[in-house]
């Protein structure tokens, strides 16, 4: 992973849309945003590669990226979109390749920076755990064919 440069973090509104952070209060989201660093990718540069372990989470500030799986394009990303949140808490292979289509300016965070943040801020860790449990419950209910919402 290339080095990050410290800059003003991602916007709270963008972070609020990240499922992992959906239960956090603005004050907690601000702490995460402030811990993020700016990163720029050149057009054509691969940011993540399908099947490889990687440790970065990114929020796109400016530019466009292409998402591919098994070589087939499955999506486009632009300002306000994010990817890689699973990498913050689990060292699992990337599900897709993300390639910058234009120069891409992102705010990013590594898993070790995220871990340090949640170790210092237990309430953030607890809210993320609760949010993850709700999502697991919803997924299990959907798999059973009973789309019941778990109370927030």
What is each of the regions a protein language model found here?
Residues 1-152:
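Cytosolic regulatory regions built on CNB/CRP/Popeye-like sensor folds
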